[in-house]
Structure formats: C-alpha cells, structure tokens
Amino acid sequence: MKLKNVFGLFIVAGLALGLAGCGGANKTVDKSSGAAEGGAKVVRIAHTQAYVPYDFVNDKGESDGFEVAVLQEVQKLLPQYKFEFVPTSDDDLLIGVESGKYDLGTKGAWLTEARKEKFIFPKEPVGASVIGLVYRKDNADQIKDIESFAKFSGKLVPIAPQNAQYNVIEAFNKTHADTPIKLVSSEAFTVADAYTWVLEGRYDAYIDIELSYKSNVEKETGSYHNLADKLSFVRYKAIPTYPVFNKKNQQLADDYDKAIQQLKDSGKIKELENKYFGEDLFQYCCPFCQQRLLW
C-alpha cells in the first residue's frame, strides 16, 4: 500500500508539472504574437536608419526623426498598444512588413498602386515630401518656378509613368494647356544621369525630391556637391508620405487614423514639423496630391 501511495504521488506531481508546462507554453506563444505585460499589444515598427530628418538613428543610438516622433505621439493616445521601434534597411522594412516580421514601417513612402496590393495604407498621411525642379544656374533669370519653366521650354527629364512625379506634371498640364511641360515617360535611370543631362542641355530641368537635392548637391559631403555652383533648385509641391501596415493590421491602421486626426486638431503635428523641418510642409500639398499620387 505504501509503495502504491508513493507511485500515486509521482503521478500527481508529473501531471502538475505537465499542466504548468502547458500553461508556460501558451504564455510564450502569446508574447510572440504581440501580447505584452499589462495587456498592451506590442507593435513592432520598422524605420529607416539615415533618412534625416524623417527617420534615423541619432547620436545617442535612439530612433529619431519626424515620422518616428509622430508615431511616438500616436502611441500616447493608444494605450492598448506598446510601440517598439526597429531601425533597419529599406528592403528589410518592406519585406518585413509584408511578411509580418514588423507590424508597420515608416520610410517617407509615397502611396503606390503596387504597394497597395502588398500593404494597408491608412487614410491619414504621417508627413509630406517636397519636390521641385533642378535646373542650370545659367537659367536662373528665366526659371523662377514651374510656370516660368514651362514657358521657358518645358523640356523635362523623362519620368517613369508609375512615379508620383509623373502624375504631378500630368496634373499641371491639365491646368496649363497653353504652356504644358513636355511630359515623356521613361524607364528608371540614375540621379547622376539626370543631373548630367540637365547640365549638357539635353533637358532644361529635372523633377527631384528637395531632401535628395540638398543631400546630394548642397551638402558639402554630398556625392554631387561639385555641381553646386552649376545647379539650382526651386520648390513646387509636397507629396504626402505614409506608414505601411501589414495586411492583417487593419484595426491598428484605423486606430492610427483616429490618433493622427487628434494630433492634427491639437496642433501637435505642426509643432513637430516646425521642430524637424522649420516649417509646415503640409501647406505645400495640393488637393490632387492628397487624393491620387502613385509612385
């Protein structure tokens, strides 16, 4: 009888350990699926590492930038989530969000039809990216803005049809039928090609992202700073930028939209724009840009 009691104790203890082990396994699965202590869902946010001032890693090794700061403010309005920011490459960001490695990613991205097939785009943009014309300094007296460029010659470096910039020029031509810009479609080419073609006189302007021009040409360490005394840049419009969400995160995207609207209403977005850009970039967004721009 004593021996049977001993065996019985071992069996009971074994069952207890087994049940405890099962309970521990469930907790591990919950954490990996996004559950955090306190009931908040962990949201992994990928961002690029050197796209200053939109998304970057600062001198302290911290995630920083306008879009990161906006999302940090979004986090404050959504206590049901716990945001974790992960600096990474462009490719890993897009592949990771699509695969579910990350819940969302932010990289100063424009809305595109191709990306809409892979990701959820929220209704509210997180920021804006200014574009304009790069032209020869020799023509500074004739080219003051996009309208004067159109009258000067309208000879623009070709643009890929799927590029948002193509739609921008297309929209301009619809409202300037008498002096349209010569809009020619083309396959991809390098920035170096575009700058060279403008300097050679093959074309009279190239539509570029202002931040890229500043980094490439105006900055002393820029790859094409040697062209700074030959090229100039003039602003035109701003194109909205969006975070991209994994296809399974519609609720997160909806919650993001509500929070962004609150931040706009409170003036927080404008405050952060002034901090990182020194001005409100949304003021340069045209109605067409807000509604339909593809990249």
PLM regions with names:
Residues 17-21:
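C-terminal motif of bacterial Sec signal peptides marking the signal peptidase cleavage site
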Residues 24, 81-84, 160-184, 258-295:
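Ligand-binding clefts/hinges and TM-proximal coupling segments of bilobed small-molecule sensing domains
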Residues 29-109, 187:
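Extracytoplasmic small-molecule ligand-binding "clamshell" domains
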Residues 49, 127-132, 221-260, 279-295:
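Periplasmic-binding protein-like
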Residues 49-52, 61-76, 133-190, 210-212:
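Bilobed "Venus flytrap"/periplasmic-binding protein-like clamshell domains
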Residues 68-78, 137-140, 147-151, 155-158, ...:
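Extended ligand-binding regions for polar small-molecule ligands
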Residues 84-149, 234:
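Acidic, polar ligand-binding/catalytic clefts
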Residues 92, 108-118, 167-171, 199-237:
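A ligand-binding cleft/hinge motif common to bilobed small-molecule-binding domains
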